[in-house]
Amino acid sequence: MGVIKNILLGLFMIGMLGVLGAQTAKVYPTKNFDRKGFYLDLRNEVMTVEAIKKFTKEIASMGLNTLVLEYEATYPYLHHATISNEVAYSRSEIQSLITYAASLGVEIIPVQECFGHVQYILRHDRYNHLSEDPKDNSQVCPLKIQADSLLFQDLFADMAAMHPSQYIHIGGDETYLLGHDDTCSAFAQKEGKSKLFVNYMKVMSEIVIKLGKTPVMWADMILKYPEAADLLPKQTILMDWNYGWKPNHFGDIGLLQQKGFKFWGASSIRSHPDNWYVTDWMTHFRNQRDYIPFARNRGYESMFVTSWSTSGLYSFTWDVGNDVLDMQPIRNNYPLSGYRILVAAYVQSLKQNHPLDGKNFVLTYAKDRFGLSESDGNKLWDCFQLAPELLVHGKPTKSTDIATMIRQNDKVREILHDINPKANEIEIQHFRLMADLRDYYLHYKAALARYNAPDFEIDSSNNLLPDVEALVAKGKELDRRFSTLNKGFLKDLEIKKQNKVRDKVVLQLLARLRNLKP
């Protein structure tokens, strides 16, 4: 009996050690990432230079030392000015920004996409011949390597000359058309998609290396197709992006680390499914909680948080011959101006040696930043837990009906409008506007559901028209609030564009209803 007792005691102690081990595994060393950075998306909702400088100063005060800028068509290309759009910065503005950031100890790393996500280049006749698919325009053909190299050598050289940073981010993510056209398909079938991808990115990386810089590329495609990874220069740094999914979502990270590749990490504070009318706050808090410890434990050298203004997917207005008349982002997020709390959550996660507790962080932030009581802090936390639900073809993805979604959002609106901050009220005003924009969206969808009802007839417009007219009036007030809150943060043209994007479908519905006459 004594033997059995000792065995049971031993098993109990082993079990306790396992429990303690699991608990202590949550406490990780505060590895001082070489670069603690922010990845700023300037493709859409384009910020003013003054706003970027102010933001740079703030993140520097928080302890960040790197700012990655994805310009797309807002960069003032020297020899390829065709690419630069109507809200592009001037070269003197970029130089001023780089100099200012350096004075704060912040290094600016430029992004120059060279494979996928190049709609902003391929939309132009000057470059369209490089497309994998002329009807898509999102990706260059990797087998047109000579012509591709001539273009991107110029673009990389421009970035290298402007930016003193040792690094150039060359993109390479989400190349969904890989092996799409006949020539590439035949190559992929014979040699594999990995070699098709790596052969191209190898050439792009070597161009950057010859410029005396270190290439950084997104890791998703090389993780998905790792077979030819050894052909890629080992100087190339792989940036693993994880916005809330399980590790190794794209592929085996350890395999590429064993091959000698260095990794940087990237979490997110604005990403899918975020848009104008919903923010998945809880996913973003959990993302910082889970991914930063993972990156530390895997030995990632640097850590960044991304903030996406859009998905990077676009809708086009085409003319005959696949000529592009217009290009619009499919998804627009609320501007970065409303997300300081998530930036702070990311920074706090970098500083501490245990995973972020989202609720405790929000309560502390509410007290320190807004002067809120614990009760109001808890209410703010409740607001962030609203399910990020949208509608698909007029139907809620989870709720029973639109009215239920409106009632849920009304609770959030009521809380936010009752909260009385003692400091930094502008930040609370952004939260209020987000909730009111969701209300605008839901009421539009409710009106649209009535418009699409099986019994909607020409006489039905008389009942629906007053509600839509009221919605248009509400939209104008929301536009005014949005313009006021983002004046000086976004470029004026961007403010007008974002208001127009939100209002367009409501105004279209109004015009149709007014035109319906017996």
Q: What does each model-found stretch correspond to?
A:
Residues 9, 25, 39-42, 157, ...:
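A general structural-boundary detector
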Residues 31-219, 237, 245, 257:
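Substrate-binding cleft of carbohydrate-active enzyme catalytic domains
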Residues 11-12, 47, 179, 226:
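A ubiquitous, low-specificity "background" feature that marks scattered single residues
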Residues 23, 115, 474-477:
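Amphipathic alpha-helical coiled-coil/zipper oligomerization segments
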Residues 25-43, 266-274:
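N-terminal small/glycine-rich loop or linker at the start of catalytic domains
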Residues 1-26:
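Bacterial Sec-dependent N-terminal signal peptides
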Residues 57, 96-99, 149-161, 165-167, ...:
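Substrate-binding groove of N-acetylhexosamine-processing glycoside hydrolases
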Residues 25-33, 68-71, 126, 282, ...:
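Membrane-targeting and insertion segments and their boundary/processing signals
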